[in-house]
């Protein structure tokens, strides 16, 4: 039964147009807006506080911060900057989804900036479900359409990411 529900969910996600997926994803991001006010600048760092608390096994990818706690993240200028870069990247991925050429170029650029970090290639897909859970931790109730949108973005993102990893001769799935 679970398989049938999952299959129906995936079929529904792919039945939507790229523009609909874009709109659904962007509407989910209203809980973490971009901006220059102190509270908006904190949104990116909030992701890393969530991430370091709930995915401690992945802290190993952050050299010098492997033992950081959420309190350490809250005081870190490094994670303020990284958080805002990540938040911008998620918004860009969502906002360019309906322009596949630009979306895929953005993914390749993202991979190019991470080639020396030794990331497990499966993380490029897993990130999107982690990000959904982060949004939910901020009080956002994601609709089925919004979840499907992030799944579609994650699938396309991962597809291009794996191609770019292979291009660099790096492990890929």
From Swiss-Prot:
Which UniProt keywords are present, listed alphabetically?
Heme, Iron, Metal-binding, Oxygen transport, Secreted, Signal, Transport
One protein family per Pfam: Globin
Consequence of mutating residue 129 to G?
A: In clone ADES3/2
User: Which residues of the sequence carry a binding annotation for heme b?
Assistant: 114
Q: Where in the cell is it found?
A: Secreted, Extracellular space
UniProt organism field:
Trichostrongylus colubriformis
Q: Name one GO cellular component term.
A: extracellular region
The protein's name is Globin-like host-protective antigen
């Amino acid at each position: 039964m679970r398989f049938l529900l999952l299959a129906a969910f995936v079929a529904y996600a792919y039945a939507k147009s790229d523009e609909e997926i874009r709109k659904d994803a962007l509407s989910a991001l209203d809980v973490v807006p971009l901006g220059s006010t102190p509270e908006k600048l904190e949104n990116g760092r909030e992701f890393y506080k969530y991430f370091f608390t709930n995915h401690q096994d992945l802290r190993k990818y952050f050299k010098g911060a492997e033992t950081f706690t959420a309190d350490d993240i809250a005081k870190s200028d490094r994670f303020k900057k990284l958080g805002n870069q990540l938040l911008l990247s998620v918004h860009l991925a969502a906002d360019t989804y309906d322009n596949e050429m630009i979306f895929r170029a953005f993914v390749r650029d993202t991979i190019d900036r991470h080639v020396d970090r030794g990331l497990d290639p499966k993380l490029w897909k897993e990130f999107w479900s982690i990000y959904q859970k982060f949004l939910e931790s901020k009080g956002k109730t994601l609709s089925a359409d919004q979840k499907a949108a992030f799944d579609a973005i994650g699938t396309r993102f991962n597809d291009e990411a794996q191609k770019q990893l292979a291009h660099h001769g790096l492990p890929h799935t």
